[in-house]
Structures are given as C-alpha cells and as structure tokens.
C-alpha cells in the first residue's frame, strides 16, 4: 500500500525543533522527500539525520525566512534536489511578547515579518514551481497531474487574541486571511491552501521563560517562553482534554491538511487545541 506522500516533495520551514521537526519526520515516514529549513544549521541537520537514520530522504537548507531573497533560494534548492514541490509548510516563527502600551516598533515588525511577510514571500516564490506547473498540466492534460498544497501555521492567539501578544495575534490572524486568499486565487489550478491553528502545545514557546531559551533577532537575544508567574499552577484548566498537546499531535494537524484525506478542503483553518475555545 502506497504511503500518504509517496513521490511527493515537501518543504517545511522552522523544522529543526518542536512541531516542525515532528512534521518533517512524519512526512518522511509517509514517503515524502523533505527539505528541512531552520534558522540554525545544527537543528536542521539533526532533523535530517533523524529522517535518514529512519530510512527517509531529506536535505537541510538553513537560513532566515525573513531575509528578502531567501524564499527563492530555499525553493530553488528544493527543485534542484528533487525536481519539484508538492507541499509547502509555513511553520517558522517565534514570539516576542509585550503589552501593547510598551511594545516597540521593532517588536511589532519583527513578528509580522516572520509570521506574515515570510509566508507571503514563500508562496509567491513557489508560484513558478506550483501554480505555473499546474497551469501547464491543465493546459496539456485537462487536469493537474500531481497533488499540490500549502499549509500555513496560525494560532489561537490569532483567532481569539491574547494578552501580551498583540504582534503575534496580528500575524497569526493575518495568515488566516492570506490562506483564504491563496485558496481562492490558486484553487483553479488544483492547489489547496489551509491553515492549522495551535492551542497549548508543549514547545519552547510555551515553557517557562526562566529556562533561558532564546532566539537571535538582528543580533539581539530574545527570550522565549512564558514567565512562570503568568503560566500559573494549572495551565490546562480551560482545555477539555486537561493537558497540553505534544509536538507530534500538533504536527498531525499539518499532516492531515496536506494529505489526500483533505483533498476537498481548502481555505479552512483547523484548530488543534484539545478543545480549548469551544
């Protein structure tokens, strides 16, 4: 029985850790050739090593998705290595929290750059490899010859807002509008586009800030996580399943929306939340 993504090429950003790494491993397990991007070379290489050690096929292409010309470089690397692109997953991101009245322009713009501008650039750069290829297939054969889709990562912070995250909320709600627009513009070429909005998932973005995880933003170390005082003693009391989700469970939402089982789903935002927000 063929795997879900046999003979498909998947490009996934932010895949060195957490949800992205879990998704990359599942895609590879299901037969995909995977292009692993991460800001840092070492975690990207670790994901590729894990895939290869399990018998899968992957390459790493590290770098910042916020660099203006990086999108074209990443997607060209995928085509050079594997000849095509079937799935693009816009997963890269981080948080840089602050209350509205204290947030700097730099904080605001940095988060919009990674969560909104970078996905826009990546999808635009994918057009020659996805939209135009599908268009040519339709002209020659009457229909696309291969499945193609885009999955954008959103958040319940975008859908519902979140205290201290006005920049992140704006970016994650903005990507929902981007998703719907892509679905409408590229649907005629058989290309689907969906979003997956995560709730409380156990990653370094939701761990205690006191653990000291950081990300480099223009030479500045930005602390990741949530202050222990804000986390409180019972972080799951508003989640019907009464627990956080794992990176693999979150990745399952990405896999589902990219899979043949979602072939008639486009423009949709799937909430992976353990039931929070219902």
Task: List where the protein language model places each region.
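Canonical Rossmann dinucleotide-binding motif of NAD(H)/NADP(H)-dependent dehydrogenases/reductases
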Residues: 3-35
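C-terminal substrate-recognition "lid" of short-chain dehydrogenase/reductases
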Residues: 82, 243-272, 277
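Active-site helix of classical SDR
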Residues: 123, 171, 179
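Alpha-helical segment proximal to the catalytic Tyr-Lys
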Residues: 128, 184-185, 263
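Residue(s) in the substrate-gating loop at a strand-loop-helix junction
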Residues: 155
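Short, small/polar-rich loop/turn modules that mediate ligand/substrate recognition or access, typified
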Residues: 187, 192, 265-267
């Amino acid at each position: 029985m063929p795997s879900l993504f046999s003979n498909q090429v998947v490009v996934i950003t932010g895949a060195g850790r957490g949800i992205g790494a879990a998704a990359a491993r599942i895609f590879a397990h299901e037969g995909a050739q995977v292009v692993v991007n991460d800001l840092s070379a070492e975690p990207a290489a670790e994901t590729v090593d894990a895939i290869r050690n399990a018998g899968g096929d992957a390459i790493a292409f590290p770098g910042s998705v916020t660099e203006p010309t990086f999108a074209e470089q990443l997607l060209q690397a995928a085509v050079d290595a594997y000849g095509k692109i079937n799935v693009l997953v816009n997963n890269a991101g981080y948080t840089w929290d602050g209350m509205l009245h204290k947030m700097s322009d730099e904080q605001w713009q940095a988060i919009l750059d990674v969560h909104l501008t970078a996905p826009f650039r990546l999808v635009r750069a994918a057009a020659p490899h996805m939209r135009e290829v599908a268009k040519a297939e339709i002209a020659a054969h009457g229909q696309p010859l291969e499945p193609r889709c885009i999955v954008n990562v959103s958040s319940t912070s975008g859908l519902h807002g979140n205290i201290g995250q006005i920049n992140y909320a704006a970016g994650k709600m903005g990507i929902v509008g981007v998703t719907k627009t892509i679905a409408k513009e590229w649907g005629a070429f058989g290309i689907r586009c969906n979003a997956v909005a995560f709730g409380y998932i156990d990653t370094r973005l939701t761990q205690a800030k006191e653990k000291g995880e950081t990300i480099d933003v223009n030479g500045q170390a930005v602390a990741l996580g949530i202050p222990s005082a804000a986390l409180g003693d019972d972080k799951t009391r508003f989640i019907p399943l009464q627990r956080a989700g794992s990176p693999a469970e979150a990745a399952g939402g990405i896999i589902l929306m990219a899979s043949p089982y979602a072939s008639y789903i486009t423009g949709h935002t799937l909430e992976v939340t353990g039931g929070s927000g219902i």
